[in-house]
Amino acid sequence: MNVDLRLIVRLLLAILLTSLVTTILMGKQIHRRLVKSMVKTTGEKDSLPARQLPKREISPKVADFPPPLTLNQTELDILKIQRNNSFRLPQQEAIKEWQDAIFFKEDSNRRGLGEQGRAVQLPNAKLNPDDFQDFYAELSDRIPLNRSLPDTRPISCRKRKYLENLPNVTVIIAFHDEHLSVLLRSITSIINRSPVELLKQIVLVDDDSNLPELGQQLEEIVAQNFPKIIHILRLPERRGSIKARMEAIRVSSCQVLVFLDSHIEVNTNWLPPLLEPIVINPHIVTRPILDAISRKTFAYAKQNTMTRSGFNWWLESESLPIFPEDKSPDSTPYRTPVLSGAMAIDRNYFLNLGGFDEQLDTWEAEKFEISFKVWMCGGMMLYVPCARVGHIGKRPMKSISSPGYHNFLARNYKRVAEVWMDNYKKYVYDKNPKLYKMANAGLLFQRKTKRNALECKTFDWYMTKVAPDFLKRYLALDSPLVFSGVIESVAFPGFCVDSLNCRHTKPVVLARCTGHNSMPGEHQNWSLTQDHEIQLTNSKDDCLEAQGLRSKSVWLFRCHKNGGNQYWYYNHRHRWIQQGQIWVWCLEAQLASGHKVGKVLANKICDKNQLEQQWKVGRNAPYDPQREPH
């Protein structure tokens, strides 16, 4: 009898367990059916019914896991500039599979218009060249808001697990006149592909949009579908993305802030890889790899090349190869001197740094300000290959009005340079002296005081420790091989090498020097870089090039960084500008008596008695015989 009773009890327990598992699975299936119920739109801006969007509940976070393996500040300071050994974050033990296997499987089986990130073309679709959005809005309206995407992560990411106890997140999206279906697709992808335990809040900041559908219609969609997770913040006047994001931070409530654009689609399991490094040390800032979404076809394309983000002295973004010690495996986060676009950062650390500089106007320079600030003030920035976010690529923006200043880029760049770049700021100003002289950077006392209070490192530390290859690629400070400024003839005082603004069409000439040492004339301002190129300082890619054999003229051509006829060396002892790597040819001035314009010739055999081959160069490299070894 006792045996029969035990069997009955076991059967009852088995039935209860089976019922519990079935309930959980059915709950997930119900949620997925809500997602599947989303239908394609008809192409009209007002035909985006709220029922297309899945409802999402926020589950309370309950966890009591073993502590993660972390880095203290001293360990982080050592790791972030490490060069001799492979760069690795601590390998964690208490790990969890965060990827939703059921959703991933269903997503991979979907077919239809735009599904799997495939290109879509409408026969009669046209792009208005004056369209603010600069993409096919009609096409976006046809593609499902919750469309499936290809898994573009490296293979090694697909089996990777992450810490069980990760912080919750506020996603911040600032927008101005974003097309409604594009904005809703951004939101839908975030909600569908983020663990409910982690995604607590999305703050949408409307930066004074004019499109009517972004008003009441957006409010109704959010109220009906996401009342507990999405908060819409309306700004009464246009303030720019920098100030808009800071307004969102003030209403955020989570431990980690994630900044995203309003025209994105997040990919599979994108969030946990961004959060784990922040748990290891809250001074680590992370960014996903940005895949490309075509503005014409909405095709989703993988970004294959792993690069770091950098800048030139125009403060334009540059892509640079990653350090050799950061290269493998391809699922490992790696260091980058600059982060742009999307970003995940610990809220307390961000606010302790002073947040974004709200005196930066509209957009753009904040990526440099936050990057310099993080690296120089105790933090580290990482790209995370296992986190992928698709981004609609738009053409370079046309000139737009600024809510606060008529030339906001010059103001922004000067403000960042004055606060963070120390002596290196002159290389930014050298690119356009007149512009930066007129630019008003605003009041800087508070930002400089904050930097001093944080005991941040110098910009020279940043250039030599964080981005040492910048000094090889671009103009270096106080290098014996480098000059910046005029190239004045010793034989013909007051005459300088002049491009005459005839790029690629005529040779450079010897002409009367214009300007003065502290501000050379626009067409007489030259820089000898550590690539041994003599660049026209006010142009980012025009270099002096010797033409043909001996006694030939010198022209201005596009810089190619391959040496050869664009390779120059300044010999301080003899004041020669030598051409080529055998150092037997010299630049020579020729000026006939009574003439106002002379010739600049290359490939003349160097002769120390030939005064026409001697040049006074720049304002950073005065003649000093002790600096010349031969």
Curated annotation (Swiss-Prot):
During embryonic stages 9-11, weakly expressed in the mesoderm. During embryonic stages 12-13, very weak expression is observed in the somatic mesoderm region. No expression detected from stage 14-15. During embryonic stages 16-17, expressed in the epidermis and the antennomaxillary complex. In third instar larvae, expressed ubiquitously in wing, eye-antennal, leg and haltere imaginal disks. Substrate binds at D207, R238, S262, W363. It is a single-pass type II membrane protein. Its cofactor is Mn(2+). Residues 1-6 are cytoplasmic. SUPFAM superfamilies: Nucleotide-diphospho-sugar transferases (SSF53448), Ricin B-like lectins (SSF50370). Keywords: Disulfide bond, Glycoprotein, Glycosyltransferase, Golgi apparatus, Lectin, Manganese, Membrane, Metal-binding, Signal-anchor, Transferase, Transmembrane, Transmembrane helix. Its main location: Golgi. Residues 333-394 are annotated as: Catalytic subdomain B. Pfam families: Glycos_transf_2, Ricin_B_lectin. Mn(2+) binds at D261, H263, H391. GO terms for cellular component: Golgi apparatus; Golgi membrane. GO terms for molecular function: carbohydrate binding; metal ion binding; polypeptide N-acetylgalactosaminyltransferase activity. It is found in: Golgi apparatus membrane. Belongs to the glycosyltransferase 2 family. GalNAc-T subfamily. This is Putative polypeptide N-acetylgalactosaminyltransferase 10. It comes from Drosophila melanogaster (Fruit fly).
